[in-house]
């Protein structure tokens, strides 16, 4: 059975959650009844609720095309595709909603493993491109996990809200700088931020079109959202966060120039769109780095804008 029912449910549920948090404020859920900071906490505010609606909508939109595509090309793998696709959507929704740094890593890995399997369904060249993505993605995941370990060693907690409070008493230290550097690099690899975009062009070119449409629209944007969340909601106001934002600003400018130039040089439209995405991610991280209310609103709006645009293309 196709996954449309599950995706429609996810979209409706995300919409209801967003409506609730807009009216009643931040919604928190303790997994397994264990109170934070010891237990895993999920936190949904209007921003994360909006991202959940966006991910669910994009997943549903791409899935409607995937059904007809698979019927025409490989009907025997529809069940496998549906299972992996729902796992990918679950991972992305978890990244958006979690209030725990390590739990974010878990959902990064869930979404990545599902994405690797889906992207490799495109054939021989897609398999090679996906293997390259797996290697680079593993480096990104390892960097993020090591960075999380540094912050746990400094504060003794992984809960984002508790971590924010404890960091105020830690002060600036080399360990904190290394930790945030590793986390930013790890998430930048996942978001295909220049110069960590090497996996993206081949994956976009050779992977099955329905998978490319969703991965290009949602996966990189969720990782960019995670960068924003960590730098502003977890580490906001710390000197290391300010330094990381300056780094992202320089990277953003280079991404805009390099991504746009490389896109113009392509003759394959899917590869051109891949390099175009590199440039667009540059605009997003540049907006994050500026940090003014207008810049942040513009960057977050461009997350929405580019996700919908790329999915349509």
Regions found by a protein language model. Name each.
Residues 53, 105-106, 273:
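Short beta-strand motif preference
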Residues 61-71, 79, 87-102, 114-313:
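Hydrophobic transmembrane alpha-helices and their helix-loop junctions in integral membrane proteins
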Residues 109:
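Short phosphate-coordinating micro-motif centered on Lys-Gly-acidic
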């Amino acid at each position: 059975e196709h996954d449309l029912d599950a995706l429609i449910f996810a979209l409706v549920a995300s919409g209801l959650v967003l409506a609730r948090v807009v009216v009643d404020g931040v919604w928190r859920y303790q997994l397994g009844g264990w109170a934070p900071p010891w237990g895993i906490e999920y936190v949904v505010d209007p921003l994360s609720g909006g991202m959940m609606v966006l991910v669910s909508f994009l997943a549903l939109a791409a899935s409607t095309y995937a059904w007809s595509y698979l019927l025409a090309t490989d009907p025997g793998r529809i069940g496998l595709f549906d299972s992996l696709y729902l796992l990918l959507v679950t991972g992305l929704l978890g990244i958006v909603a979690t209030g725990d740094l390590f739990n974010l890593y878990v959902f990064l890995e869930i979404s990545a493993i599902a994405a690797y399997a889906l992207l490799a369904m495109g054939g021989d060249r897609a398999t090679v491109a996906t293997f390259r993505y797996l290697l680079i993605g593993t480096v990104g995941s390892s960097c993020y996990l090591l960075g999380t370990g540094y912050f746990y060693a400094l504060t003794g907690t992984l809960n984002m809200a508790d971590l924010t409070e404890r960091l105020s008493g830690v002060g600036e230290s080399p360990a904190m700088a290394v930790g945030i550097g590793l986390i930013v690099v790890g998430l930048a690899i996942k978001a295909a931020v220049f110069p960590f975009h090497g996996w993206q062009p081949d994956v976009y070119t050779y992977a099955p079109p329905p998978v490319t449409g969703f991965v290009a629209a949602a996966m990189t944007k969720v990782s960019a959202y995670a960068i924003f969340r960590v730098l502003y909601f977890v580490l906001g106001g710390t000197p290391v966060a300010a330094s990381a934002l300056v780094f992202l600003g320089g990277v953003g400018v280079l991404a805009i120039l390099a991504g746009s130039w490389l896109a113009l040089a392509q003759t394959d439209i899917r590869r051109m769109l891949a390099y175009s995405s590199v440039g667009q991610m540059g605009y997003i991280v540049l907006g994050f780095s500026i940090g003014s209310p207008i810049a942040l609103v513009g960057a977050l709006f461009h997350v929405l804008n580019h996700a919908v645009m790329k999915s349509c293309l």
